[in-house]
Every structure is written in structure tokens, then in C-alpha cells.
A protein has these predicted regions:
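Amphipathic terminal alpha-helices
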Residues: 2, 272-291
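N-terminal Rossmann NAD(P)H-binding glycine-rich loop of SDR-like oxidoreductase domains
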Residues: 2-24
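SDR active-site strand-loop-helix element
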Residues: 7, 30, 75-76, 113-119, ...
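N-terminal Rossmann-fold cofactor-binding loop
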Residues: 29-39, 53-54, 77
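NAD(P)H-binding glycine-rich loop region in Rossmannoid oxidoreductase-like domains
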Residues: 51-94
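Catalytic helix-loop patch of NAD(P)-dependent Rossmann-fold dehydrogenases
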Residues: 93-100, 120-159, 164-166
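NAD(P)-dependent short-chain dehydrogenase/reductase
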Residues: 138, 150-199, 206
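Mid/C-terminal beta-alpha module of Rossmann-like enzyme folds, strongest
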Residues: 203-206, 210-258, 287-288
């Protein structure tokens, strides 16, 4: 059985990965705070290291030594939504330098890092970005994530992607924001080619099992959709009365071209209908537990 360490098991990606992987792999995870503060976090079949501080010297190495994992999936990061409120040095360290520290440890200990990058390394001026396109983001978040991309190590696979999904604690992402609204502008010229967090978990599972030697930088994406259609289709599935006004006076196309990844792995991205159906079921299931 594969032995996997998820760094950052309470975030939007980390908590989904942990819940999905726990029945498939020997699983370990790090938590920023005490385990008892996460009421909705799965606590069975996972060996947690709580109160984890990335700034504490040698702690990451100690945890890796304790786990001896085959794979480390790095979900630790300061997100775009809170980057402007965060310390510049902290953003650059956590998003830019910490992945390199983990990669060096992986090389020493003969394990493999899966580093998660973002479509936000691009400005969004043109879309259909390939791995060869020059990263042209100029905001603090985008620049920090550019620094964290590892392209030339046998010990690291960097996946450039974008994701949507539910959160369990800090709710800053698109979906949690959307669910709290009554009326919004839906951007018809904001193009998105991401995956749900649940689909990305399946992608990473496939890599670890079928393509463990894959390394370097790869884009992973779905078929592009504009955010108006994305949110409108989700609201219809949920039968939520959220008024979505079509808004065209904003353009941003960070869509990724994942032809290289598809050719290498045979991956077939699911339709948005399928991904949103799964996401809507997760939302409705969570709503039921709150009653």
C-alpha cells in the first residue's frame, strides 16, 4: 500500500484529498491548528500531525522521517483571496520557498513531491496557456506561485491547475462565496478551465498509482467555461434562488492547455455537467447535516 503525506490537510484541497485517500493509502496529514478545532474534519484512518508550523526549523524533516512516505502532496499555501491581507515575506516563503525546501528533502530521502501550482501564474490576457508560455502575473500571489514551481527535478511533479470546491474552515473560495449570495454579477468573459477538488483528487490518485515516475511541470485542466455559465448551472442543480446578472465588462482568460498531460497519461477530463453534478450533491449532503 502506498504511503502518502498530505501537507495542509484542512484546506479546500487538503481536506478533500485526505478524505478521498484515507481508504486507499496509508495516510498522514499536517494541520495548522489543534485537531480538536476542526469539527468537520475526517479523523479516522489518518495519522495527523497537528499544530504544524512551516516556519519551525527541522519540523518538516522530522515529520517526513516519521512517515517515510512514498509521496508528499503539498497543499500548504496562502491563497489569492487572502494574499493582499497577508505579510509579503510570509507569502513568498510559504508559496515560493517552502516547496523548494520540501523538494530538497524529497531528493535526500528518495521520496516524491507533488507540488500544486495555479493558473494565476498568468495574467489572463490571452488564455489557452501551455507549459512553454511565459508566466506574466505581476501581483504578489501570482509572483509567489511562479517562484514555487519546480520544473527540473526528478523528485517533483508540479501540477499547474485551478480548482473549485467546498471548504471546512476558512471559506474564501468562489463556491463558498457564491453560496452566501442572493444576487451577483456573473462574468461572461472570465474563462475558467479548472477542476473540482474531488476530480483533482482522482487525478493525483491516478498519477501516484499509474505514473509514479512522472516529473516536471504539467498543466491539468478541463474544457473552458465562463464563470456566468458555471455558477448558473450550479445554481440550477441546487435549485437555489440566486440571481445571476450577466456581466461582460470584465475580461480574464487563464484557461490552461493540458494536451501534454493528456498525451502522457491518457487522462480524459470529465464534462462540467458531471463535475457540477457531483459538487451539487456534496453541497446538498452538507446542507442536510446542518439541519
Amino acid at each position: 500500500m502506498l504511503n502518502v503525506l498530505v501537507l495542509g490537510s484542512s484546506g479546500m484541497l487538503g481536506h478533500v484529498f485526505s478524505d478521498y485517500f484515507k481508504n486507499k493509502f496509508q495516510l498522514h496529514g499536517t494541520l495548522k491548528n489543534s485537531l480538536k478545532t476542526y469539527r468537520n474534519l475526517s479523523s479516522t484512518k489518518i495519522n495527523y500531525f497537528d499544530n504544524f508550523d512551516v516556519l519551525e526549523e527541522n519540523l518538516s524533516e522530522k515529520i517526513i522521517d516519521d512517515c517515510n512516505p512514498h509521496f508528499i502532496v503539498n497543499c500548504i499555501g496562502i491563497t489569492k483571496q487572502i494574499a493582499d491581507q497577508s505579510n509579503k515575506e510570509a507569502i513568498n516563503f510559504i508559496n515560493g520557498e517552502y516547496p523548494k525546501i520540501i523538494e530538497k528533502l524529497c531528493k535526500q530521502k528518495k521520496t516524491k513531491l507533488i507540488q500544486l501550482s495555479t493558473d494565476c501564474v498568468f495574467s489572463g490576457k490571452k488564455g489557452n496557456y501551455t507549459e512553454e508560455d511565459i508566466c506574466d502575473a505581476d501581483d504578489i500571489y501570482g509572483v509567489s506561485k511562479i517562484k514555487g514551481e519546480i520544473k527540473d527535478s526528478d523528485s517533483c511533479l508540479t501540477l499547474r491547475k485551478s480548482t473549485i470546491g467546498l471548504e471546512i474552515k476558512d471559506k474564501h473560495g468562489l463556491i463558498e462565496w457564491f453560496l452566501d449570495q442572493k444576487e451577483i454579477d456573473g462574468y461572461k468573459n472570465a474563462i475558467f478551465s479548472g477542476l473540482t477538488s474531488y476530480e483533482l483528487a482522482r487525478v493525483i490518485e491516478k498519477i501516484m498509482i499509474d505514473f509514479p515516475q512522472l516529473h516536471g511541470l504539467y498543466n491539468v485542466s478541463s474544457n473552458p467555461i465562463n464563470k456566468y455559465d458555471l455558477l448558473r448551472n450550479l445554481s440550477l442543480l441546487l435549485r437555489r434562488e440566486i440571481k445571476i446578472n450577466p456581466f461582460e465588462d470584465f475580461f480574464c482568460d487563464r484557461s490552461l492547455n493540458s494536451s501534454r498531460f493528456i498525451e502522457k497519461t491518457g487522462y480524459n477530463p470529465p464534462s462540467w455537467e458531471r463535475m457540477l453534478m457531483e459538487l451539487s450533491k456534496k453541497i446538498l449532503e452538507r446542507d442536510e447535516t446542518k439541519k
